[in-house]
Curated annotation (Swiss-Prot):
InterPro entries: CmoA (IPR005271), Methyltransf_25 (IPR041698), SAM-dependent_MTases_sf (IPR029063). This is Carboxy-S-adenosyl-L-methionine synthase. SUPFAM superfamilies: S-adenosyl-L-methionine-dependent methyltransferases. Its EC number is 2.1.3.-. Catalyzes the conversion of S-adenosyl-L-methionine (SAM) to carboxy-S-adenosyl-L-methionine (Cx-SAM). Belongs to the class I-like SAM-binding methyltransferase superfamily. Cx-SAM synthase family.
Length: 274
């Protein structure tokens, strides 16, 4: 699910680097074939920072908390190729590296050699641009950008995994296996931060939350055509779970406990502890 970068400009809410020249999201300004489905292609990648800023309520606040969590749970439990102790972190479904950049932001307080970050995404368009942005902004940090499907991707031992707005794009039948692989890779004391669009299971509550979400998008400049176009394109592509389903699944794969630490309309972020 993840804001991106360029040199010196900062987003006022998230305090992470963003592109100086904003490419506005106009993907759905013209009617699309009803059979068209949303994908993270070059057109989406080009406007992704604007798209996620205007489409995901609370996104900047969620990113800003990642280094705070990392400071508490990254224990330098791994050894890098140079024999130095580091904390390995995975950013799964990294998109343009927003979560990775949030961790490395100067306010996070991590030194250049304290974290080893592996950023993984299935979209070649995303990883190609993410690699450029991360290299431009954090050339001296230990970051590896990997193009891969996180299903079946082998994780090395790590202290923290970030799964932001990603699980929701996987078939429901594949989600437990992905979480199991994350749990197995985490060291004791490690955490998973899981952020997802959700639903409550109550028809009336969900209808209200969805309409307020569309109001949020209208307030951010999206037209009715854009809102309906993206809704249609995401049908059967983005499939939400309830918070209860998420927490039950986390318990099933072995996490000691999990909690919802942030919620804004129908978006929520959870942390699971090993």
């Amino acid at each position: 699910m993840s804001n991106t970068t360029d040199a010196d400009a900062k987003h006022p809410q998230s305090n992470i680097l963003v592109e100086e020249t904003v490419v506005y999201d106009n993907v759905f300004t013209t009617p699309l074939d009803k059979a068209a489905r949303f994908s993270f292609d070059e057109q989406v990648v080009a406007c992704f920072p604007d798209m996620i800023r205007r489409s995901v309520p609370g996104y900047g606040q969620m990113l800003a908390m990642l280094p705070i969590f990392a400071k508490r749970h990254c224990q330098a439990g791994q050894v890098n190729a140079e024999g130095k102790r580091v904390s390995r972190v995975y950013d799964l479904g990294c998109s343009l590296g927003g979560a990775t950049m949030a961790l490395l932001n100067e306010k996070g307080g991590f030194g250049k050699e304290e974290l080893q970050i592996k950023a993984v995404d299935i979209s070649p368009a995303m990883t190609q641009k993410a690699e450029v942005l991360l290299q431009q902004n954090y050339p001296e940090h230990d970051i590896e950008v990997i193009t891969a499907d996180i299903r079946g991707f082998e994780l090395e031992p790590c202290d923290m995994v970030i799964l932001n707005l990603t699980l929701q794009f996987l078939p429901p039948a594949d989600r437990t296996q992905v979480l199991q692989s994350i749990y197995n890779a985490l060291n004791d004391g490690g955490i998973l931060v899981l952020t997802e669009k959700t639903h409550t299971g109550d028809e009336q509550d969900d209808a209200w939350l969805v309409e307020r979400y569309y109001d949020f998008k209208r307030a951010n400049g999206y037209s009715e055509l854009e809102i309906s176009g993206k809704r249609n394109a995401l049908e059967n592509v983005l499939i939400t779970d309830t918070l209860d389903q998420h927490h039950q699944r986390l318990a099933e794969v072995g996490f000691n406990r999990s909690l919802t630490w942030f919620q804004f309309l129908n978006f929520a972020s959870m942390v699971a502890f090993k």
